[in-house]
Every structure is written in structure tokens, then in C-alpha cells.
A protein has these predicted regions:
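A glycine/proline-hinged amphipathic helix-loop "lid/cap" segment
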Residues: 2-96
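Alpha/beta-hydrolase superfamily serine-hydrolase fold, recognizing
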Residues: 16, 24, 28, 82, ...
């Protein structure tokens, strides 16, 4: 057999394997092969700690969070983003010089204890580029050194300022940031602050107690989040407050008065059951709501390099630009 024939055979075999794996991924999980690969990657890279180690790690988290957050250098954002100090909080503003009266306030996730990951920044960079709107990314106060009350105070002030200067404002948040975004909007009802034109929630953490009995059915397929670890971080954020306080668990808050809510949630994450409850609560409250169910998707699938994330990004852009 000639060398070129061997190479051709290897290439064809490789393509056949890829095709078979793609078909299997579609049949078994109803998702792309890349999404299945990402889930495997997450299983091996996302650590689930012993609860004792989580508590011991608080001191390290405080040291990290006390340092000034630095945007990932490989995303080359230095000329595109302005960094400002907003009432003692680090704030990044994308498209600051653009002549637009539309703005996005994005509240990142991280279990209320971690700073934004590379994927967060890459995602908001895409949003800023594709919309051309001003995009605000606050590095809000984190547990265990700070609690939800401090974050609510500074974020409410920031939102009110953004709201007063723009005709259209879109509030977005992922995971813990999604729960915080929803809780903020519920507090706006009480404080008579104008609602965002659209509230966009990506896999929001909306009940920090994680006491929903149905969650246990999703533990085996969840590659990222540990129920026990996440509960500890949530209690640190609560700092002694009742866990059913809507500012911590907006699933229990008043939804009557919210304007328009969009929920993106994967079916292979422990937060899925609570988000289905939230969707039904919003329907019962006569709130305009749309549920984007990511079949076979993992936590905050929107930020990963998979075909489903590209579809979800287009859906987000359609919401914002309609």
C-alpha cells in the first residue's frame, strides 16, 4: 500500500469516527458533538471540594478578591474597554465612546465568591461588539468578606444612573449574577425604579438554599456545580440573613411588576428544576416571559465554544435588538 493511500485511509477513518460520534451525541443527548466534548472537559476541570476545604478556602478567596481584577490579556481589550472606579467598585465599560442611548448592564456569575472567568469576558466582548451598545461590567463586592447588602446598594445606584442616561437598558446576569439581577429587579418594584427593557437570565441561581427535592435527579449529570459546595458559598453571601429573603433567593420574591424576562437554562444542570418553577411563577404573575430550554446543555452553556451557544447568542441579540 502506498503512503498516500495509508494517509487517505487514516483521514477517512478519522472522519468516520467523527461522524459516528456526532450521530451518537445527537441520538443520546440531543446535542452537538462539541457540546458533549465540553461536558467531558468540565467534568475533569471543575473541582467539587470537600465541604471542609470550601470553608478553608475562604481566606484564599478574600486575598484574590482584594486584588484589582485584571482583564485577560489574550482578549486584547485594553483599547476597547475603559476601567473606572464607581463608588469604590471596579467597573469596566465597553464601547464607552460610542454614540448610543442603549446600554447593557451585565452581572457576572461565580457563586458570589469568584471574579469573572475568561469565558465571561469573552462573552461580554462579543455582546459589546455585536450590539455596539455601552456595556457595563461591575466587579461587585463578593463573599465571604462582603454580603449581598453591599452589592445591592452599589448595583442599584449604578443601574439607576445607567437608566437615567439611556432610552433602552438591558439587564443581564449568569448563574449567581442571574439571581442577583432578578433580585435587583424585584427590589426595583419596591423602590419604584424603572424596570430594564429586558431582563436576560443565563442559568440563574434563584434559590441559594437548593432545597428543591427534584435537584437530586440532576446531580449525576451536572459536571460543574456541587450542591453542598454551592450551599456553603450561598450562606456566606447571606451572612446570617434568611435564605428565603428574595434578595438572596428571588424565586420567592414578588414578580408582579417585572417587565419582560428571558430565561436560558440547560437541562443537564442542578438549577434546571428551580428555573422551571420560576417560569411558571412568572406566567402566573402575568409577566411577559420566554423560556429558552437548552436540551442536553450544561450550566451557562451560552459562554462555551459550541454550536448551541452561537444559537443562544443570536437569540439574545434578537431580544436586545428587536
Amino acid at each position: 500500500m502506498e503512503v498516500y493511500e495509508i494517509i487517505l485511509l487514516i483521514v477517512l477513518s478519522f472522519l468516520l469516527i467523527i461522524i459516528c460520534l456526532t450521530i451518537l451525541s445527537r441520538i443520546i443527548y440531543q446535542r452537538s458533538l462539541m457540546a458533549s466534548i465540553v461536558e467531558i472537559f468540565l467534568k475533569f476541570t471543575c473541582k467539587k471540594y470537600d465541604d471542609e476545604d470550601v470553608v478553608k478556602g475562604f481566606e484564599k478567596l478574600v486575598r484574590i478578591n482584594d486584588k484589582k481584577y485584571v482583564l485577560p490579556k489574550r482578549l486584547m481589550l485594553k483599547k476597547q474597554v475603559k476601567e473606572v472606579d464607581y463608588k469604590g467598585m471596579q467597573l469596566f465599560v465597553f464601547n464607552e465612546s460610542n454614540n448610543t442611548n442603549k446600554a447593557i448592564l451585565y452581572i457576572h456569575g461565580g457563586a458570589y465568591v469568584r471574579q469573572p472567568r475568561y469565558e465571561h469576558i469573552k462573552y461580554v466582548k462579543k455582546l459589546a461588539k455585536k450590539t455596539g451598545y455601552k456595556l457595563y461590567l461591575p466587579i461587585y463586592p463578593k463573599a465571604p468578606k462582603h454580603s449581598f447588602k453591599e452589592a445591592y446598594e452599589v448595583l442599584t445606584s449604578l443601574y439607576s444612573e445607567i437608566r437615567s442616561k439611556n432610552d433602552k437598558v438591558f439587564l443581564m446576569g449568569d448563574s449567581a449574577g442571574g439571581g442577583l439581577a432578578l433580585g435587583l429587579c424585584q427590589s426595583f418594584i419596591e423602590e419604584n425604579i424603572r424596570q430594564p427593557d429586558e431582563l436576560i437570565l443565563l442559568s440563574p441561581w434563584i434559590d441559594i438554599s437548593l432545597e428543591n427535592e427534584r435537584i437530586k435527579d440532576y446531580v449525576k449529570v451536572e459536571p460543574m456545580l456541587s450542591v453542598s459546595n454551592t450551599k456553603i458559598w450561598g450562606k456566606a453571601w447571606a451572612n446570617g440573613a434568611r435564605l428565603d429573603d428574595y434578595r438572596l433567593s428571588p424565586l420567592y420574591g414578588n414578580c408582579i411588576g417585572l417587565k419582560s424576562v428571558n430565561i436560558f437554562i440547560g437541562t443537564r444542570e442542578i438549577l434546571y428544576p428551580d428555573n422551571i418553577i420560576l417560569y411558571n411563577v412568572l406566567l402566573e404573575s402575568k409577566v411577559k416571559v420566554k423560556l429558552y430550554k437548552g436540551i442536553g446543555m450544561n450550566h451557562v452553556y451560552n459562554v462555551y465554544p459550541i454550536p448551541e451557544a452561537r444559537i443562544a447568542l443570536k437569540q439574545v441579540l434578537d431580544i436586545i435588538k428587536k
